[in-house]
Amino acid sequence: MAIASISSPAPVASQQSTLVTEPPLTSSMLLTQVGSVLAGILLFILLIAWLARKLGFAPQAKQNKLLKVVSSCPVGQRERVVIVEVDNTWLVLGVTAQQITPLHTLPAQPTNDSSSTGDTKPVDFNQLLKKVLKRPEKSE
């Protein structure tokens, strides 16, 4: 058996291997590649932070005990009417991008704490996703 394997020529000699080598990366190519990856990661982090804030997952700032927003109602794209409680007095304010105008003053009234805008609980993501993905049925 050993003699038969010695006498037969190996087909390896007829095949030649060709190695394709890539040119080495220059410093400018490497810097561009690393910079673009870093910029992509930063944009991804900013996008996640923006989504967390919009969906209500970001922690809310501590409430100021001297000033409490009782209610708020948008009346335009950047205009809103806000009721603020200060020293047992409700101030009805008109708020725009340029100014805040006092509209009316009322004595403070007892409010339901659950309806207060400052005590809103964060929305459950699962419920929010189901609400967004729910498609209205078409009626013809």
Curated annotation (Swiss-Prot):
<dbReference type="InterPro" id="IPR052205">
    <property type="entry name" value="FliO/MopB"/>
</dbReference>
<dbReference type="GO" id="GO:0044781">
    <property type="term" value="P:bacterial-type flagellum organization"/>
</dbReference>
<dbReference type="GO" id="GO:0009425">
    <property type="term" value="C:bacterial-type flagellum basal body"/>
</dbReference>
<feature type="transmembrane region" description="Helical">
    <location>
        <begin position="31"/>
        <end position="51"/>
    </location>
</feature>
<keyword id="KW-0843">Virulence</keyword>
<keyword id="KW-1003">Cell membrane</keyword>
<comment type="function">
    <text>Required for both, motility and virulence.</text>
</comment>
<dbReference type="InterPro" id="IPR022781">
    <property type="entry name" value="Flagellar_biosynth_FliO"/>
</dbReference>
<protein>
    <recommendedName>
        <fullName>Protein MopB</fullName>
    </recommendedName>
</protein>
<comment type="similarity">
    <text>Belongs to the FliO/MopB family.</text>
</comment>
<dbReference type="Pfam" id="PF04347">
    <property type="entry name" value="FliO"/>
</dbReference>
<keyword id="KW-0472">Membrane</keyword>
<dbReference type="GO" id="GO:0005886">
    <property type="term" value="C:plasma membrane"/>
</dbReference>
<keyword id="KW-0812">Transmembrane</keyword>
<keyword id="KW-0975">Bacterial flagellum</keyword>
<feature type="compositionally biased region" description="Polar residues">
    <location>
        <begin position="104"/>
        <end position="119"/>
    </location>
</feature>
<feature type="region of interest" description="Disordered">
    <location>
        <begin position="104"/>
        <end position="124"/>
    </location>
</feature>
<keyword id="KW-1133">Transmembrane helix</keyword>
